[in-house]
UniProtKB/Swiss-Prot annotation:
Omega-N-methylarginine: modified positions: R96, R132
Any GO MF annotation of the entry: actin binding
Organism of origin: Mus musculus (Mouse)
A GO CC annotation given for this chain: cytoplasm
PANTHER family: LASP (PTHR46218), LIM AND SH3 DOMAIN PROTEIN LASP (PTHR46218:SF4)
Reported function: Binds to actin and plays an important role in the assembly of the Z-disk. Isoform 2 might play a role in the assembly of focal adhesion.
Modified residue annotations for Phosphoserine: S230
PROSITE patterns, sorted: LIM_DOMAIN_1 (PS00478), LIM_DOMAIN_2 (PS50023), NEBULIN (PS51216), SH3 (PS50002)
Keyword tags: Actin-binding, Cytoplasm, LIM domain, Metal-binding, Methylation, Phosphoprotein, Repeat, SH3 domain, Zinc
Residue numbers bearing the Phosphothreonine modification: T135
Protein name (Swiss-Prot/TrEMBL): LIM zinc-binding domain-containing Nebulette
InterPro entries given in the database record: LIM-SH3_domain_protein, Nebulette_SH3, Nebulin_repeat, SH3-like_dom_sf, SH3_domain, Znf_LIM
Domain LIM zinc-binding: 3-63
Chain ranges of the SH3 domain: 210-270
Length: 270
């Protein structure tokens, strides 16, 4: 059944129907309420479900309220109540020695980063004092996390010197076996190096550990902190190791920079 026109009340057929302002109109009946100018869907303005042209569109006016004695009294009373509440809150928080800060996601991320750095520094100091006498410590989750963070830093330091070992190993049939610093000093003092022939299977044993994986960046990322790295979409991230939920540690192959990066920005490629 065909609807009726909102202005003239007659039946509106599909060939001349205009559906606007939740009503149906004839094309000839869809005009400004004031000047009767014909309107269309591109130049009309609706006010209280009636069409208007741009010139006669009702302007909303604001009424200025005078500062009467009653309004001034209410304003002064509100200010006094605000001062009383502020003083009461100040007295309650006095002596606590801290300010209440909103716990935003950015502050949470910075807090986690500072905790990781503190744990790594603590473990480094512990390693320096090892052997001078120690107290047995129970393996709790915090100690496990410290050990994991230290392993990440140690692996990163190992990757930093590994290219030099590869360059030395390019001599056919000869490699320089990795030795501990103490063993190297002892050999050097005795006046001879430590070399031997090797086979292809021995060379394979010196490849990087299986957990040092390569990833590719899916998005651009700008570093938000000193211990993070920036990368672009398509960059390859090598020697990637997980740190905790949501964060990894790796080297951007294009720039050579090493640091922390978000895990949801990269994908595994090998």
């Amino acid at each position: 059944m065909n609807p009726q026109c909102a202005r003239c009340g007659k039946v509106v057929y599909p060939t001349e129907k205009v559906n606007c302002l939740d009503k149906y109109w004839h094309k000839g009946c869809f005009h400004c309420e004031v000047c009767k100018m014909a309107l269309n869907m591109n130049n009309y303005k609706g006010y209280e479900k009636k069409p208007y042209c741009n010139a006669h569109y009702p302007k909303q006016s604001f009424t200025t309220v005078a500062d009467t004695p009653e309004n001034l009294r209410l304003k002064q009373q509100s200010e006094l109540q605000s001062q009383v509440k502020y003083k009461r809150d100040f007295e309650e928080s006095k002596g606590r020695g801290f300010s209440i800060v909103t716990d935003t996601p950015e502050l949470q991320r910075l807090k986690r980063t500072q905790e990781q750095i503190s744990n790594v520094k603590y473990h480094e100091d512990f390693e320096k004092t090892k052997g001078r006498g120690f107290t047995p410590v129970v393996d709790d989750p915090v100690t496990e996390r410290v050990r994991k963070s230290t392993q990440v830093v140690s692996d990163a330091a190992y990757k930093g010197v590994q290219p030099h070992v590869v360059e030395m190993d390019r001599r056919p049939g000869i490699i320089v076996a990795p030795v501990l610093p103490g063993a190297y000093q002892q050999s050097h003092s005795q006046g001879y190096g430590y070399m031997h022939q090797t086979s292809v299977s021995s060379m394979r044993s010196m490849q990087p550990p299986a957990h040092l994986r390569t990833y590719r960046a899916m998005y651009d990322y700008s570093a938000q902190d000193e211990d993070e790295v920036s990368f672009r979409d398509g960059d390859y991230i090598v020697n990637v190791q997980p740190i905790d939920d949501g964060w990894m540690y790796g080297t951007v192959q294009r720039t050579g920079r090493t640091g922390m990066l978000p895990a949801n920005y990269i994908e595994f490629v090998n």
